[in-house]
């Protein structure tokens, strides 16, 4: 912060994500299932790839935009004070794993391609000489984590959908005068950032309330 105030430079001078990309590394003509972030810092946890000594660098993160893996939340006990058990089951679906492996391999190949490779001193990755599926899968499972844009926890749906908390007018079933109009109401997440859909849901809910 002080470097930016004094000289107008330093990490605070960055937006945090300098560039991004949407792609489908398995079928480029199909919908994009990977969103990539290009971050101007060494963005990696010490327990996944080791302590990074380099001061300057760039990180690329690959994010699944439409994951098929499903986790669950269940009660830990009959005591309401006990926190629930949360099982994310990240990358448990075979197609998610295939897409993540393809995304990792795609960007590693990009970084090794000229003329970009001429500007790169070092690529930090467990084993650059062995990009077989098994090794990439191991890396993905060690470094996978959740990202932004949680949604769909109180989704809209048809009357016969037992998992649908809300009706089509965003009203909570079984409770009068209560609606949910944030991203929780989305039945499915969109393939990308959720700011615009969140605003749209709020606007639509306001129209529904005023109309009723």
Residue ranges and their predicted role:
Residues 2-197, 205-212:
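FAD-dependent oxidoreductase catalytic-site/capping-region signature
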